[in-house]
């Protein structure tokens, strides 16, 4: 271990990474550089600086970076162009944040001359894979330290005992227990552990922190509009906004109306199933709006092909392959499809739902003249359908004739 002189730690200031900070100092006898990413998690981050200083990290080795705009612009929005949902439901709020954190970890390692980077992901979860695949893709020779795979602290009980033995404060929630395992950023908040580990038990309402209970949401619906240019949201209710500002505003609306709650049992990349509770208020509104604008601007063939590619694209992000050539290849195709995804979507927000109720676009492929039930003035000859059906039925008739 003597070859490790300096480590950059992805540091939240919470219990796990505070224990890791002390453990790195004790075990590796090395300098530790802390990096705390502001991804819009809604927490005051200066306490992380104070705690790092208290544990012996000098000011010039404490990095707290505001990455909110980069996060939404370069990671969330490209993913949303693909309509990505892992296993049909999960909007990938944790998964999509990991490559950006890894990217900045590697940048800081280069800036400070560090020998290694470290993270607080456990050996059971997906995050260890996401952090490390991204790190190796960006810096093939980097050393990655994953304490949960090295030390003998095999449970949260053991972790808390170690923390108390080394005078590291252990936070308590309002119920007098150690907190749930949570992750938060501008896109979502996730909770795992304790009562959530039983997939039969309904999530207690006190676990939810980002949305009101839909039953308690306003009794009057609220209507909003989102403007899109080339597949990306650019304005809310006619007011131009940056990517992060737009998502934050949608989060406020989603919170108010109880939108974006998801109770999910998912298949982890490492092989086990896990149960998590996700709150993605603004992301759910945005995702539905993006689908809405695509519905009138994308050709059927392109739209259906995108839907076929989406599960693979979502799986690549979930599994940690953001920086892989296959993800970049799919992204190029997806981005090409968005060239004319322009226009405005109107949504109705009401008691947990975000419904598209209107859409318009200068690039609309919707032709009211062709689709009308009234006189179409010769736009469409219904007799043409007979030949279309006959040709498409040919193979079915031949199969039937052979008794197949």
UniProtKB/Swiss-Prot annotation:
<keyword id="KW-0067">ATP-binding</keyword>
<feature type="binding site">
    <location>
        <position position="122"/>
    </location>
    <ligand>
        <name>L-aspartate</name>
    </ligand>
</feature>
<feature type="binding site">
    <location>
        <begin position="10"/>
        <end position="18"/>
    </location>
    <ligand>
        <name>ATP</name>
    </ligand>
</feature>
<dbReference type="GO" id="GO:0005737">
    <property type="term" value="C:cytoplasm"/>
</dbReference>
<keyword id="KW-0547">Nucleotide-binding</keyword>
<feature type="binding site">
    <location>
        <position position="127"/>
    </location>
    <ligand>
        <name>L-aspartate</name>
    </ligand>
</feature>
<dbReference type="InterPro" id="IPR014729">
    <property type="entry name" value="Rossmann-like_a/b/a_fold"/>
</dbReference>
<feature type="binding site">
    <location>
        <position position="130"/>
    </location>
    <ligand>
        <name>L-citrulline</name>
    </ligand>
</feature>
<dbReference type="GO" id="GO:0000050">
    <property type="term" value="P:urea cycle"/>
</dbReference>
<feature type="binding site">
    <location>
        <position position="126"/>
    </location>
    <ligand>
        <name>L-citrulline</name>
    </ligand>
</feature>
<keyword id="KW-0963">Cytoplasm</keyword>
<feature type="region of interest" description="Disordered">
    <location>
        <begin position="173"/>
        <end position="200"/>
    </location>
</feature>
<dbReference type="GO" id="GO:0006526">
    <property type="term" value="P:L-arginine biosynthetic process"/>
</dbReference>
<dbReference type="GO" id="GO:0000053">
    <property type="term" value="P:argininosuccinate metabolic process"/>
</dbReference>
<keyword id="KW-0028">Amino-acid biosynthesis</keyword>
<feature type="binding site">
    <location>
        <position position="266"/>
    </location>
    <ligand>
        <name>L-citrulline</name>
    </ligand>
</feature>
<dbReference type="InterPro" id="IPR018223">
    <property type="entry name" value="Arginosuc_synth_CS"/>
</dbReference>
<keyword id="KW-0436">Ligase</keyword>
<dbReference type="InterPro" id="IPR048267">
    <property type="entry name" value="Arginosuc_syn_N"/>
</dbReference>
<feature type="binding site">
    <location>
        <position position="278"/>
    </location>
    <ligand>
        <name>L-citrulline</name>
    </ligand>
</feature>
<feature type="binding site">
    <location>
        <position position="181"/>
    </location>
    <ligand>
        <name>L-citrulline</name>
    </ligand>
</feature>
<keyword id="KW-0055">Arginine biosynthesis</keyword>
<dbReference type="InterPro" id="IPR001518">
    <property type="entry name" value="Arginosuc_synth"/>
</dbReference>
<feature type="binding site">
    <location>
        <position position="126"/>
    </location>
    <ligand>
        <name>L-aspartate</name>
    </ligand>
</feature>
<comment type="similarity">
    <text>Belongs to the argininosuccinate synthase family. Type 1 subfamily.</text>
</comment>
<dbReference type="Pfam" id="PF00764">
    <property type="entry name" value="Arginosuc_synth"/>
</dbReference>
<feature type="binding site">
    <location>
        <position position="190"/>
    </location>
    <ligand>
        <name>L-citrulline</name>
    </ligand>
</feature>
<feature type="binding site">
    <location>
        <position position="90"/>
    </location>
    <ligand>
        <name>L-citrulline</name>
    </ligand>
</feature>
<feature type="compositionally biased region" description="Polar residues">
    <location>
        <begin position="179"/>
        <end position="192"/>
    </location>
</feature>
<comment type="pathway">
    <text>Amino-acid biosynthesis; L-arginine biosynthesis; L-arginine from L-ornithine and carbamoyl phosphate: step 2/3.</text>
</comment>
<feature type="binding site">
    <location>
        <position position="37"/>
    </location>
    <ligand>
        <name>ATP</name>
    </ligand>
</feature>
<dbReference type="InterPro" id="IPR048268">
    <property type="entry name" value="Arginosuc_syn_C"/>
</dbReference>
<protein>
    <recommendedName>
        <fullName>Argininosuccinate synthase</fullName>
        <ecNumber>6.3.4.5</ecNumber>
    </recommendedName>
</protein>
<dbReference type="InterPro" id="IPR024074">
    <property type="entry name" value="AS_cat/multimer_dom_body"/>
</dbReference>
<dbReference type="Pfam" id="PF20979">
    <property type="entry name" value="Arginosuc_syn_C"/>
</dbReference>
<dbReference type="GO" id="GO:0005524">
    <property type="term" value="F:ATP binding"/>
</dbReference>
<dbReference type="GO" id="GO:0004055">
    <property type="term" value="F:argininosuccinate synthase activity"/>
</dbReference>
<comment type="subunit">
    <text>Homotetramer.</text>
</comment>
<dbReference type="InterPro" id="IPR023434">
    <property type="entry name" value="Arginosuc_synth_type_1_subfam"/>
</dbReference>
<feature type="binding site">
    <location>
        <position position="95"/>
    </location>
    <ligand>
        <name>L-citrulline</name>
    </ligand>
</feature>
<feature type="binding site">
    <location>
        <position position="120"/>
    </location>
    <ligand>
        <name>ATP</name>
    </ligand>
</feature>
């Amino acid at each position: 271990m003597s070859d490790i002189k300096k480590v950059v730690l992805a540091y939240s200031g919470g219990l796990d990474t505070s224990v890791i900070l002390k453990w790195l100092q004790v075990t590796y006898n090395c300098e530790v550089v802390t990096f705390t990413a502001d991804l819009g998690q809604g927490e005051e981050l200066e306490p992380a600086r104070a705690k790092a200083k208290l544990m012996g990290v000098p000011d010039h080795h404490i990095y707290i970076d505001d990455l909110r705009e980069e996060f939404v612009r370069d990671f969330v929005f490209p993913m949303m162009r693909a309509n990505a949902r892992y296993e049909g439901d999960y909007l990938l709020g944790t998964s999509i944040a990991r490559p950006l954190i890894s990217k900045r970890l590697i940048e800081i390692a280069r800036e400070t001359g560090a020998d290694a980077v470290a993270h607080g992901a456990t050996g059971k979860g997906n995050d260890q894979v996401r952090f490390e695949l991204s790190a190796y893709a960006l810096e093939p020779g980097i050393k990655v330290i994953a304490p949960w795979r090295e030390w003998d602290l095999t449970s949260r009980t053991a972790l808390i005992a170690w923390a108390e033995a080394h005078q590291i404060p252990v936070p308590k929630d309002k119920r007098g227990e150690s907190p749930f395992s949570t992750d938060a950023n501008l896109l979502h908040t996730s909770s795992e552990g304790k009562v959530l580990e039983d997939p039969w038990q309904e999530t207690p309402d006190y676990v939810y922190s980002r949305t009101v209970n839909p039953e308690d949401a306003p009794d009057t619906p609220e209507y909003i509009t989102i403007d899109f240019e080339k597949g990306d949201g650019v304005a809310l209710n006619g007011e131009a906004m940056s990517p992060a500002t737009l998502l934050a505003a949608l989060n406020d609306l989603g919170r108010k109306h109880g939108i974006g709650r998801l109770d999910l049992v998912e298949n982890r990349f490492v092989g086990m199933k896990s149960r998590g509770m996700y709150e993605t208020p603004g992301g759910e509104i945005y995702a539905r709006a993006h689908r809405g604008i695509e519905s009138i601007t994308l050709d059927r063939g392109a739209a259906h092909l995108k839907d076929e590619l989406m599960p693979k694209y979502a799986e690549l992000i979930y599994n940690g392959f953001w920086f892989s050539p296959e993800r970049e290849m799919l992204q190029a195709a997806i981005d090409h499809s968005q060239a004319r995804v322009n226009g405005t979507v109107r949504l109705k927000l009401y008691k947990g739902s975000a419904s598209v109720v209107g859409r318009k676009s200068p690039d609309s492929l919707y032709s009211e003249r062709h689709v009308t039930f009234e006189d179409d003035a010769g736009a469409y000859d219904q007799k043409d359908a007979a030949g279309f059906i006959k040709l498409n039925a040919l193979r079915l008739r031949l199969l039937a004739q052979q008794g197949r």
